């Protein structure tokens, strides 16, 4: 009787946790198979308010949850068993912490008496994510602990969290009930009697108000700030911040808007999108050096040239707007940081600058670069930048775009085309790893249900190869565009002192192609070596209800040679 009560109470605790998370706003739960997490798994299987996603690899599962959370703008739960299964979530948790994405890890664990004694699959799990997650340690389910205490623990742990939370759940055996019939929380268990009112409602047990510290400048401070030559910089901005409002702000003040690849504004015709290249354009750089005020929205800028410009310029006033308490300035400039949503800050009572339109010549220089890229990239040899520009120009309102790290995101930042409308753009630029990129894109696609394009390098795809199993399960279009230059050829752009050392220790040429990987997971596959074939394959893939792969094969030096050629032209302008 006692062991059956243990299994039932385990299950009730699991069900209470999942029910409360659903009421708090969790829409998705990502699950990996395992025995010690059985009370959570069985509870999730019965939970009708959550959409379930399953994958055998916890590393990919964590990144899929990251993509789901980015797309849904809501926390996502992850269920794993004990041991190294939990540790495999670490890369995704780090990325989520750095970029303020809320993930909730529910890890099954052994009870205290089975730790540090040689028991199977038992490690010390509390604190495994160091300072990259808020830590909550639940005891083993106990009838002497009121269910209200469990609910308030969950509520406090998750309320107003914009970063990962790790809830470690210890369970004693038996883990499996003798039968699983009616919904767990519909039982006549005396343990649930104190929750009868809560069970009849749909709201969380404890409702926390939204806590958001907002700081705004006074009208007088704004008037003084705009009295001079300034620039506005759009860094990493999420879609819910409504970055489009920065266009109107730029036009109202009369200062140029310099846009990063992650700003949602990189391709906007009213922005100075080619800022990375303009900073090596002699006339443009000389003009930009006249600025003495800067208004930065967001952080995590991609362009080293833009970062250097912000570091080297002597600013009279430096303002940065961030939605969360954070330090996002590797140059450590003296500044005033305002805590606000970008759109809300842009809607303040701004005045026309006394030096409005001081940098209008930048528009001419920006247009010159646009024409250069059309001639030399769009109508030049087939290559990586040409493919990136083609993707960015194709049906942008119909799809969302996830750009992989290393060379792909830099090509987009340097050469993205001007467009009247752009796709919602996502990246993983917190820790900027090349792991989990496909899995993240799968999470984006799984939530939105709209066409999603992933631009990914060959090493990044090899790193996340088994996430093709997640891609295979998708019902909406996911176009996986692999830029295969046979290794880590971003190192062609870095000052490695010896070519042999570059190839042996950095580039790691592999000679692999992805046709057999596509066949293994039964995914449509095309290999292309010219723009016309790519565009045909790409448009077809956007209409396919599921994942497909397009492999773009180029030489190891195609992109780096083209970058060097374009840099030379820009510097001589």
UniProtKB/Swiss-Prot annotation:
InterPro entries xrefs: DHS-like_NAD/FAD-binding_dom, MenaQ_synth_MenD, MenD_middle, THDP-binding, Thiamin_PyroP_enz_TPP-bd_dom, TPP_enzyme_TPP-bd
Cofactor note: Binds 1 thiamine pyrophosphate per subunit.
EC class of the enzyme, as a word: transferase
CDD domains from the UniProt entry: TPP_PYR_MenD, TPP_SHCHC_synthase
EC number: 2.2.1.9
Cofactor: Mg(2+); Mn(2+); thiamine diphosphate
GO-annotated molecular function: 2-succinyl-5-enolpyruvyl-6-hydroxy-3-cyclohexene-1-carboxylic-acid synthase activity; magnesium ion binding; manganese ion binding; thiamine pyrophosphate binding
Known pathway: Quinol/quinone metabolism; 1,4-dihydroxy-2-naphthoate biosynthesis; 1,4-dihydroxy-2-naphthoate from chorismate: step 2/7; Quinol/quinone metabolism; menaquinone biosynthesis
Keywords of the record: Magnesium, Manganese, Menaquinone biosynthesis, Metal-binding, Thiamine pyrophosphate, Transferase
Catalytic activity: isochorismate + 2-oxoglutarate + H(+) = 5-enolpyruvoyl-6-hydroxy-2-succinyl-cyclohex-3-ene-1-carboxylate + CO2
Any one Gene Ontology BP term: menaquinone biosynthetic process
Superkingdom of the organism of origin: Bacteria
Family: Belongs to the TPP enzyme family. MenD subfamily.
Subunit relationships: Homodimer.
Role, per record: Catalyzes the thiamine diphosphate-dependent decarboxylation of 2-oxoglutarate and the subsequent addition of the resulting succinic semialdehyde-thiamine pyrophosphate anion to isochorismate to yield 2-succinyl-5-enolpyruvyl-6-hydroxy-3-cyclohexene-1-carboxylate (SEPHCHC).
Official protein name in the record: 2-succinyl-5-enolpyruvyl-6-hydroxy-3-cyclohexene-1-carboxylate synthase
């Amino acid at each position: 009787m006692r062991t059956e009560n243990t299994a039932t109470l385990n299950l009730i605790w699991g069900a209470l946790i999942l029910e409360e998370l659903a009421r708090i706003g969790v829409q998705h739960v990502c699950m990996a198979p395992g025995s010690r997490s059985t009370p959570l798994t069985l509870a999730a299987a019965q939970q009708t308010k959550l959409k379930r996603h399953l994958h055998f690899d916890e590393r990919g599962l964590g990144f899929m949850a990251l993509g789901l959370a980015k797309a849904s703008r809501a926390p996502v739960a992850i269920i794993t068993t004990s041991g190294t299964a939990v540790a495999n979530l670490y890369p995704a948790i780090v990325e989520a912490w750095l970029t303020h994405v809320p993930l909730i890890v529910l890890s099954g664990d052994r009870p205290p008496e089975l730790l540090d004694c040689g028991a199977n699959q038992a490690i010390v799990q509390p604190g495994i994510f160091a300072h990259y997650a808020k830590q909550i340690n639940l005891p083993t389910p106990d009838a002497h602990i009121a269910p209200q205490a469990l609910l308030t623990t969950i509520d406090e742990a998750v309320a107003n969290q914009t970063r990962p939370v790790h809830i470690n759940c210890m369970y004693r055996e038996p883990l499996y009930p003798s039968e699983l019939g009616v919904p767990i929380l519909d039982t006549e268990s005396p343990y649930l009697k104190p929750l009868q009112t809560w069970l009849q409602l749909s709201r969380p047990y404890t409702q926390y108000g939204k806590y958001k510290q907002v700081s705004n400048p006074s009208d007088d401070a704004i008037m003084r700030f705009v009295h001079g030559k300034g620039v506005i910089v759009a860094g990493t901005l999420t879609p819910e911040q409504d970055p489009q409002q920065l266009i109107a702000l730029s036009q109202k003040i009369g200062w140029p808007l310099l846009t990063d690849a992650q700003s949602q504004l990189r391709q906007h015709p009213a922005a100075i999108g080619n800022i990375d290249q303009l900073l090596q354009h002699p006339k443009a750089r000389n003009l930009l050096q006249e600025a003495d005020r800067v208004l930065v929205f967001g952080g995590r800028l991609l362009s080293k040239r833009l970062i250097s410009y912000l570091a080297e310029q002597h600013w009279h006033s430096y303002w940065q707007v961030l939605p969360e308490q954070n330090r996002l300035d590797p140059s450590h400039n003296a500044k005033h940081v305002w805590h606000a949503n970008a759109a809300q800050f842009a809607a303040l009572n701004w005045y026309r600058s006394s030096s409005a339109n001081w940098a209008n010549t930048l528009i001419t220089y920006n247009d010159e670069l646009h024409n250069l890229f059309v001639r030399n990239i769009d109508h030049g040899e087939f290559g990586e930048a040409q493919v990136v520009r083609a993707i960015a120009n194709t049906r942008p309102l119909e799809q969302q775009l996830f750009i992989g790290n290393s060379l792909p995101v830099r090509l987009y930042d340097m050469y993205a085309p001007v467009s009247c409308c752009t796709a919602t753009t996502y990246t993983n630029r917190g820790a900027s790893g090349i792991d989990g990129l496909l899995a993240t894109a799968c999470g984006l696609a799984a939530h939105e249900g709209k066409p999603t394009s992933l631009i990914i390098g060959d090493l990044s795809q090899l790193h996340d190869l088994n996430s093709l199993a997640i891609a295979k399960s998708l019902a909406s279009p996911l176009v996986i565009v692999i830029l295969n230059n046979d290794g880590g050829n971003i190192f062609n752009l870095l000052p490695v002192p010896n070519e042999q050392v570059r190839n042996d220790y950095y580039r790691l040429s592999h000679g692999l192609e992805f046709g057999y990987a596509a066949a293994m997971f039964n995914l449509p596959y095309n290999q292309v070596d010219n723009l016309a074939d790519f565009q045909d394959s790409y448009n077809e893939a956007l209409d396919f209800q599921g994942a497909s792969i397009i492999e773009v094969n180029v030489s190891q030096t195609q992109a780096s040679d083209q970058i060097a050629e374009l840099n030379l032209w820009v510097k001589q302008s």
